[in-house]
Amino acid sequence: MYYGLDIGGTKIELAIFDTQLALQDKWRLSTPGQDYSAFMATLAEQIEKADQQCGERGTVGIALPGVVKADGTVISSNVPCLNQRRVAHDLAQLLNRTVAIGNDCRCFALSEAVLGVGRGYSRVLGMILGTGTGGGLCIDGKLYLGANRLAGEFGHQGVSANVACRHQLPLYVCGCGLEGCAETYVSGTGLGRLYQDIAGQTADTFAWLNALRCNDPLAIKTFDTYMDILGSLMASLVLAMDPDIIVLGGGLSEVEEILAALPQATKAHLFDGVTLPQFKLADFGSASGVRGAALLGHGLDAGISYEA
């Protein structure tokens, strides 16, 4: 059996897959994000529970928020206790088995490239538009991670100067410590903040969407601004990576208005003659991360380092 664990800021999901990568069972529990010892004990306990249920020792793959460096050290995670820790190495010592680990957005991309809507395409770019923004690039079914495992952290690219000037955008401070990261505008949190600044009132993404569908002028202005920012980011990714397909996940990807406007918004920032990639919704949605983690444990992606 193959186990995938998707670690979030508030929850941990463990899923069990058979040898054909068909889902057999899954469950969730709270993330003990402040105490590393409690976190590791929780993971070990849940994996042993899965072993007992399956009657065998399954392979283990972990998807988590943050950058996993080449030596397995986790940095820039929103789960505080994981930063500067070698999670896979430490868990492997507890379990006495190999543990694979990767960034959750990269696992999303891998899942969709190998098993999902990106299957059959050579160059698959996965992109999450949710609480945060990030993704991953798969080439012929393998993750491209880069020299420092940073490939896919495009949420921390700066917003282009022409877009910032055109809309007189405020410089939002990102959780990474920088200002003006694309994530601070195109994530769900960023869109809500953008609407608050334009409308001059406290509101969230849900309030914005309701107002947009009622043809509120300020909501429409927010939408146009948002699509210009997102289109510029997408165009930069098209120029840098030239994917066959861009697979979208996260809550904002399910907003019909955004998905419908995205190709034209991207094209507006590209020179004439450029062929756009296909834009498609993920097949597995929020389950892509845990499925991608199982793929790491399965050993189908040789680009990930394993800790034994």
From Swiss-Prot:
Record's subcellular location: Cytoplasm
Reaction catalysed by this enzyme: N-acetyl-D-galactosamine + ATP = N-acetyl-D-galactosamine 6-phosphate + ADP + H(+); N-acetyl-D-glucosamine + ATP = N-acetyl-D-glucosamine 6-phosphate + ADP + H(+)
Binding-site residues for ATP, renumbered to this chain: 4-11, 132-139
Keyword Cytoplasm (UniProt): yes
Gene Ontology process terms (BP): N-acetylglucosamine metabolic process
Record-listed Zn(2+) binding positions: 156, 174, 176, 181
Keywords: ATP-binding, Carbohydrate metabolism, Cytoplasm, Kinase, Metal-binding, Nucleotide-binding, Transferase, Zinc
Pfam families for the chain: ROK
InterPro entries: ATPase_NBD, ROK, ROK_cs
Enzyme Commission number: 2.7.1.-, 2.7.1.59
GO CC aspect terms: cytoplasm
GO molecular function: ATP binding; metal ion binding; N-acetylglucosamine kinase activity
Protein family membership: Belongs to the ROK (NagC/XylR) family.
Function: Involved in the pathway of N-acetyl-D-galactosamine degradation. Catalyzes the phosphorylation of N-acetyl-D-galactosamine (GalNAc) to yield D-galactosamine 6-phosphate (GalN-6-P). It can also phosphorylate N-acetylglucosamine (GlcNAc).
Additional information: In Shewanella sp., the active phosphotransferase system (PTS) specific for the transport of GalNAc and GalN is replaced by a set of GalNAc- and GalN-specific permeases and kinases (AgaP and AgaK, respectively).
PANTHER family reported for this sequence: N-ACETYL-D-GLUCOSAMINE KINASE, ROK (REPRESSOR, ORF, KINASE) FAMILY
Protein's name according to its UniProt entry: N-acetylgalactosamine kinase AgaK
Organism: Shewanella sp. (strain ANA-3)
